[in-house]
Amino acid sequence: MYPAHLLLLLAVCVSLLGASAIPPLPLNLAQFALVIKCADKGKRPRWHYMDYGCYCGPGGSGTPVDELDRCCKTHDQCYAQAEKKGCYPKLTMYSYYCGGDGPYCNSKTECQRFVCDCDVRAADCFARYPYNNKNYNINTSKRCK
């Protein structure tokens, strides 16, 4: 092998080692977004639920600001229950069907069914309650105590 080839091989190996240290992204968030779209018939962009109230988005604390935020708190609690069962809700991919009445789970494993049920219940809840623009991107340190 030529020295240039060895350097290239070394560079590839080092970059792969670095990539293995990157934590995986929550794989089912894109799937959850599709379940939400199915439930609300595409009325609201999915990213609007990523930073709403005290519980919609990463983390969560305090008292939910409204019923929609309460849907997110319940979803967080459902994911916590899934973790207690040994499931990985943010990484679990599942099978669902989008029917005229909304999403339905048809997953095979217990973890897939549990996580899918969490997501479908949350998506149905989102579709049921109004979205208040004043609760998007709020100051959580002041309003979520």
Swiss-Prot record:
<feature type="binding site">
    <location>
        <position position="55"/>
    </location>
    <ligand>
        <name>Ca(2+)</name>
    </ligand>
</feature>
<feature type="propeptide">
    <location>
        <begin position="22"/>
        <end position="27"/>
    </location>
</feature>
<feature type="disulfide bond">
    <location>
        <begin position="71"/>
        <end position="125"/>
    </location>
</feature>
<keyword id="KW-0732">Signal</keyword>
<feature type="disulfide bond">
    <location>
        <begin position="54"/>
        <end position="144"/>
    </location>
</feature>
<feature type="disulfide bond">
    <location>
        <begin position="38"/>
        <end position="98"/>
    </location>
</feature>
<dbReference type="InterPro" id="IPR001211">
    <property type="entry name" value="PLipase_A2"/>
</dbReference>
<dbReference type="GO" id="GO:0005543">
    <property type="term" value="F:phospholipid binding"/>
</dbReference>
<protein>
    <recommendedName>
        <fullName>Basic phospholipase A2 P'513</fullName>
        <ecNumber>3.1.1.4</ecNumber>
    </recommendedName>
</protein>
<keyword id="KW-0964">Secreted</keyword>
<dbReference type="InterPro" id="IPR033112">
    <property type="entry name" value="PLipase_A2_Asp_AS"/>
</dbReference>
<dbReference type="InterPro" id="IPR016090">
    <property type="entry name" value="PLipase_A2_dom"/>
</dbReference>
<feature type="disulfide bond">
    <location>
        <begin position="78"/>
        <end position="118"/>
    </location>
</feature>
<dbReference type="GO" id="GO:0050482">
    <property type="term" value="P:arachidonate secretion"/>
</dbReference>
<feature type="binding site">
    <location>
        <position position="59"/>
    </location>
    <ligand>
        <name>Ca(2+)</name>
    </ligand>
</feature>
<dbReference type="GO" id="GO:0005576">
    <property type="term" value="C:extracellular region"/>
</dbReference>
<keyword id="KW-0443">Lipid metabolism</keyword>
<dbReference type="InterPro" id="IPR036444">
    <property type="entry name" value="PLipase_A2_dom_sf"/>
</dbReference>
<keyword id="KW-0378">Hydrolase</keyword>
<feature type="disulfide bond">
    <location>
        <begin position="105"/>
        <end position="116"/>
    </location>
</feature>
<feature type="signal peptide">
    <location>
        <begin position="1"/>
        <end position="21"/>
    </location>
</feature>
<dbReference type="InterPro" id="IPR033113">
    <property type="entry name" value="PLipase_A2_His_AS"/>
</dbReference>
<keyword id="KW-0106">Calcium</keyword>
<feature type="binding site">
    <location>
        <position position="57"/>
    </location>
    <ligand>
        <name>Ca(2+)</name>
    </ligand>
</feature>
<dbReference type="GO" id="GO:0047498">
    <property type="term" value="F:calcium-dependent phospholipase A2 activity"/>
</dbReference>
<keyword id="KW-1015">Disulfide bond</keyword>
<dbReference type="GO" id="GO:0016042">
    <property type="term" value="P:lipid catabolic process"/>
</dbReference>
<feature type="active site">
    <location>
        <position position="75"/>
    </location>
</feature>
<feature type="binding site">
    <location>
        <position position="76"/>
    </location>
    <ligand>
        <name>Ca(2+)</name>
    </ligand>
</feature>
<comment type="similarity">
    <text>Belongs to the phospholipase A2 family. Group I subfamily. D49 sub-subfamily.</text>
</comment>
<feature type="disulfide bond">
    <location>
        <begin position="87"/>
        <end position="111"/>
    </location>
</feature>
<comment type="function">
    <text>PLA2 catalyzes the calcium-dependent hydrolysis of the 2-acyl groups in 3-sn-phosphoglycerides.</text>
</comment>
<keyword id="KW-0479">Metal-binding</keyword>
<feature type="active site">
    <location>
        <position position="119"/>
    </location>
</feature>
<dbReference type="Pfam" id="PF00068">
    <property type="entry name" value="Phospholip_A2_1"/>
</dbReference>
<dbReference type="GO" id="GO:0006644">
    <property type="term" value="P:phospholipid metabolic process"/>
</dbReference>
<keyword id="KW-0442">Lipid degradation</keyword>
<feature type="disulfide bond">
    <location>
        <begin position="56"/>
        <end position="72"/>
    </location>
</feature>
<dbReference type="GO" id="GO:0005509">
    <property type="term" value="F:calcium ion binding"/>
</dbReference>
